[in-house]
Amino acid sequence: AIYGKGGSGKSFALSNLSYMMAQQGKRVLLIGCDPKSDTTSLLFGGKACPTIIETSSKKKLAGEEVSIEDVCFQRDGVFAMELGGPEVGRGCGGRGIIHGFELLEKLGFHEWGFDYVLLDFLGDVVCGGFGLPIARDMCQKVIVVGSNDLQSLYVANNVCKAVEYFRSMGGNVGVAGMIVNKDDGTGEAQAFAKAVDIPVLCAIPANEEIRRKSANYQIIGKPGGEWAPLFEELAINVAKAPPQRPTPLEQDGLLDLFSPEETGGNVQLIPASQADMRGG
């Protein structure tokens, strides 16, 4: 299960990783578990997959059953699908994730034969539905995606906290490592990974060509391409890295990775009094 802040590059990294794995002869299933349903867009050249939840609703109204052909699509050996979620303001995204996995089980999820199943999860939301793979030991490894900015590392740290909590409750899921995306060389993401005791699986540079090709829905993780070694390395590391129990940071520890001028870390908390609140 791959977690990260929205916009951190999870879908970009996963689309290229899954493509490279498939080209290496692995059977790969990529499942988008983000209500935005955009995990597979890069893989399919910008085209949107019909989501499992939306398709299920339409089929139910028509008195029909969902079949795998309705929701799973493939490109060059990568199988991919989107769970989907409710429309804005019309339901619970976390509950949608739970419902989506229930539908996957009806479709035979546990009987499918894949070498890797990659789950793309939004990390900003802390509700139980999005933590399902961690809470129920549904995945073998968690990977976090982040950059050299406080907000993406805040989300990565929260994911590490969730993993640590469920490990303390007897769970088995661990963090295999971190993908550093848009790496500008400032080093905060690497410092974070070291502090929480997880390895860096890959550092994808902040590069204009990568940004442009990603924006144009082009896969760069193709064997023989300029960026192929990056994703070949990532595929190897994802396969080999053992799930580890992280040591998440407290808020002050996270802020200490950055200079106070960048984060406002030198601001002091001054308690308010009742007189202050009343304007006295």
Short names for language-model regions:
Residues 164-280:
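C-terminal lobe/tail of nucleotide-utilizing enzymes
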Residues 35-37, 85, 123, 184:
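Short, glycine/acidic-enriched loop or turn micro-motifs at the edges of active sites
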Residues 23, 106-116, 121-212:
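Conserved catalytic-core segment of NTP-binding enzymes
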Residues 6, 39, 81, 100, ...:
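Residue-level signature of catalytic and energy-coupling elements of molecular machines
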Residues 20-80:
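N-terminal phosphate/diphosphate-binding loop that engages ATP/GTP or pyrophosphate donors
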Residues 1-28:
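Walker A (P-loop) phosphate-binding motif
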Residues 85-95, 150:
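Flexible beta-alpha connector loops of hexameric P-loop NTPases
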Residues 95-106:
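Conserved helicase/translocase P-loop NTPase motor core
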